[in-house]
Amino acid sequence: MKRSQLGFTLIEIIFVIFIIGMAVSVISIAVGGNAAADMTRKEAEEFMLQASYISEQSVLKGETQGLFVELRPAQDIDAEEQWCYQWRRVRDRQWQDLPELSPHCLPEGLVIEFVVDDELWEFDPELEYQDPVMGFFPSGDGSGKVEVSIYTDQLKGGQTSVTEELELDLAGELHWLSEEKRIEEDKRGR
């Protein structure tokens, strides 16, 4: 007399779980995001939020406010140099740190670059006093045309470089050019 099989064998269950696991891993690799692109976009968003806040505060408080940028040296042997920026305001004829915004450093491997009035701005560590890279005035105007690029350092990451571009125009308006382009492409794609 033969017994009828009422369930699955252990081998069959293990095989099905293996197939499902393989399918999930293939899908996650195919759909998985670009970490460098996500990090670059997050930093551009942070910069945009801070600059918009500073622009508004400059008008509301009647203060001139500026952006100071520096390349900080590596802190230990395994670390890399880091780009950091800090917003300051003019009080008593000198630049003072803003208490509401602490200095912000980009993650290692990211670079921030400025083109001020069509000239590439370069950080000079030898200077005792650095001028602000860009600023906002109480009138609502900006300090001039400034193009800001945040991107991955291709030499260190071995990854595809993703650049986020922002621009401050003469009227003090800040535009996230990369985001505007993405939105326009999404509209055309529909």
What are these model-predicted stretches?
Residues 1-31:
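N-terminal single-pass transmembrane signal-anchor helix
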Residues 64-69:
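Short, hydrophobic-rich beta-strand element in sensory/regulatory alpha-beta domains
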